[in-house]
């Protein structure tokens, strides 16, 4: 099923038809090892924020300075999410636990990690974005659910080490893939 989804999704358009993406599929023991190591790193960051320089993504996904209307949208989304899971403003412990759910792939059995060669430019990020959307649509058409995640990007060194990804690639994002648990609020 995963191979079928990726085959269909890889038909996405790309500049000069170079289809520059790579996808690393993670399940089983590798998934567990990856989750464990990245969660440990995130807990270390919670306790020692001064170590953040050790965990930087290779490209800026979000702006350094949020502006209107994006800051309002971001806050509304955050407040809505935390409200649904009963996390009050300032409750650092509960916020940290919720944040760790990202690095547990929200309990999905499959993690997909999307990379590009570092020499490629912005156009290739647009190309891989179309491919990623195709993955999400193809998965949904086959009864699976997805959650795209940029949260993994600062931990690319850990990911690359565990998955043996070459240093000439950069992590664009991850996707949690599985069946949604409809009994959960989020």
List where the protein language model places each region.
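Acidic, surface-exposed loops and disordered segments
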Residues: 1-186
């Amino acid at each position: 099923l995963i191979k079928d989804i990726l085959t269909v999704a890889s038909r996405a358009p790309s500049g000069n038809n170079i289809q520059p993406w790579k996808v690393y599929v993670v399940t089983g023991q590798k998934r567990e090892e990856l989750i464990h190591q990245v969660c440990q790193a995130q807990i270390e960051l919670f306790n020692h924020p001064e170590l953040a320089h050790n965990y930087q993504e290779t490209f800026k996904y979000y702006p350094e300075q949020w502006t209107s209307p994006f800051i309002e949208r971001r806050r509304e989304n955050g407040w809505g999410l935390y409200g649904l899971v009963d996390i009050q403003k300032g409750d650092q412990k509960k916020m940290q636990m919720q944040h760790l759910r990202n690095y547990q792939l929200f309990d999905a059995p499959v993690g997909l990690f999307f990379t590009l060669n570092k020499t490629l430019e912005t156009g290739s990020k647009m190309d891989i974005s179309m491919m990623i959307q195709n993955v999400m649509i193809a998965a949904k058409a086959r009864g699976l659910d997805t959650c795209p995640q940029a949260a993994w990007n600062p931990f690319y060194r850990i990911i690359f080490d565990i998955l043996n990804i070459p240093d000439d690639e950069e992590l664009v994002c991850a996707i949690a893939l599985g069946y949604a648990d409809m009994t959960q609020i989020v």
